[in-house]
Amino acid sequence: MKCPFCGFIEDKVIDSRPTDEGSSIRRRRECTKCSRRFTTYEKVESLPLMVIKKDKSRQPFNREKLMNGLLRACEKRPISINDLEKMVENIEAQLHNSLQREVTTVDIGEIVMSKLKTMDEVAYVRFASVYRQFKDINTFMDELRKLLREEKIE
């Protein structure tokens, strides 16, 4: 790191500690030439996660949209807001950990459905009815039959 006082490029780290709830690191450094101390901050470069919509347009990932969809699916169900927040955080972390900068709405929908299926089957069916755009009662019933078959297998 270049010393802000003398411009020398060698220094030693005197102290290092996490800040901003672990999202950055504060370092105290000492220049090996002029012995003056200075502080630097390191932060992970966060690249925005882009969502590819069905019409091929792109927009930044929006966790509020995800949360609103879950709230609608879980309306009047015994699922706490806390549980939904954890699910949103988990899904967002899963998407970021995939190391892909772009993700499709299909991928997000499949992740949400797999998590809802284990949490609450009614919420799962509600979400699936919007996500899969059931055109009539038969496609809706097919999804219910599939869910019941999977339940029997388990």
Curated annotation (Swiss-Prot):
Biological process annotations from GO: negative regulation of DNA-templated transcription
Coiled coil: none
Residue ranges of every copy of the ATP-cone domain listed in the record: 49-139
Keyword Cytoplasm applies: no
Cofactor(s), names only, from the UniProt record: Zn(2+)
Span of zinc fingers (unnamed): 3-34
GO molecular function, one term: ATP binding
Pfam annotation, one family: Zn_ribbon_NrdR
Family: Belongs to the NrdR family.
Cited function: Negatively regulates transcription of bacterial ribonucleotide reductase nrd genes and operons by binding to NrdR-boxes.
Protein name: Transcriptional repressor NrdR
